[in-house]
Amino acid sequence: MKIAIVGKGGSGKSTTSWLLSRFLAQTYSVLAIDADHNMDLASILGFEVKDDTRTFHRVHSEFQQIVGLEQDTKWSRIVLEDRVLPQFTFQPLDEFTQSISYEIDPHISLQVVGLGAEDILYSSRCAHGHSGPLKFYLPLLQEGDNQVIIDGVAGADMLHFGLFCGVDALVGVVEPHINSKKVFEQLRVLAAKLDIPFYGILNKPRENDLYNNIKQEYKDILLGEIPIDEAIIEYNFEGLNANTNEALKDIWSELQSRYIKVDTLARLRDFESKRAEKAVM
């Protein structure tokens, strides 16, 4: 399953991405993708992005060549034109996937978009442009029985770009905070328009009216909540208390029970087609 973790900045997206990656790595092989500006997931996993790290934003030409797209042409042509597209695989690793993946441990590999890299400064591309390869890589990635966790950019902007059309589920992290709830609702509405399954995880729970309101209003899509745990603050997975471990089991069980495999490439093709229609209006 390919799962993108989204939400308001500071809601706990990167921490949730780390928790799920570590939890799932106990049973599956996991591909963790850091698609955020801050590159916190990479840091939490103990990886340092350097000048020579092969990130998505540094392999544009190579990716375009692999998918048969001439340089300096619209990326949407990848899915809008009749062409034979490659399939990328996580296990076994295809050549391209292997070239941009870094082994964190025997069960977790990491890919990084690179939005926080120093060479982004003065770049002619915006964050959308730098994320282009990932956008078209995701629906072409065959994960098999493995799991893919993507730590997304804060807010709803990347949904407007269609970055997550290639995922099986969007999981919004929401905390009992008015702005966090506002962004969560924006994400929910956009996901519905894009026909991407959307679920929620309550983070930093505390008893107040907003907490109760969120639990009631979104009870049909909430997978569970992550309790306060000192080990989470210290990024000590082995030190998680029993309540946190049980919460992660419940969240994963809920997500699995709702999972329906769909053609994500067709979803991206539909998105780009509608986008092209809007552009000529």
Predicted regions and their residues:
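P-loop (Walker A) phosphate-binding loop of NTP-binding proteins
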Residues: 8
